[in-house]
């Protein structure tokens, strides 16, 4: 058994997919970047609202709600982009080729 983060993976699976450790590390980094973005984005949004609240007073609960929602949206975006990079890395490690452009835009 091979330890992969908190879970254990069979040796046969780890041998079949040699890039599994790199992919797991990439995903872990992507999720931690998302958590950091959530904390930072929420703090920045809350600080900005405290600055704006001097001119346009409104209840604190709305400041917290808007800050958390803004932090969540930005964090989701960052995590999605970073996870897509990890997916591309996984495809490259498995096939040896860069993934094709999967956009639906048909311009040539």
From Swiss-Prot:
<dbReference type="GO" id="GO:0005739">
    <property type="term" value="C:mitochondrion"/>
</dbReference>
<dbReference type="GO" id="GO:0016020">
    <property type="term" value="C:membrane"/>
</dbReference>
<comment type="similarity">
    <text>Belongs to the TMEM141 family.</text>
</comment>
<dbReference type="Pfam" id="PF15110">
    <property type="entry name" value="TMEM141"/>
</dbReference>
<keyword id="KW-1133">Transmembrane helix</keyword>
<keyword id="KW-0812">Transmembrane</keyword>
<protein>
    <recommendedName>
        <fullName>Transmembrane protein 141</fullName>
    </recommendedName>
</protein>
<dbReference type="InterPro" id="IPR026788">
    <property type="entry name" value="Tmem141"/>
</dbReference>
<dbReference type="InterPro" id="IPR038259">
    <property type="entry name" value="Tmem141_sf"/>
</dbReference>
<feature type="transmembrane region" description="Helical">
    <location>
        <begin position="58"/>
        <end position="78"/>
    </location>
</feature>
<feature type="transmembrane region" description="Helical">
    <location>
        <begin position="32"/>
        <end position="52"/>
    </location>
</feature>
<keyword id="KW-0472">Membrane</keyword>
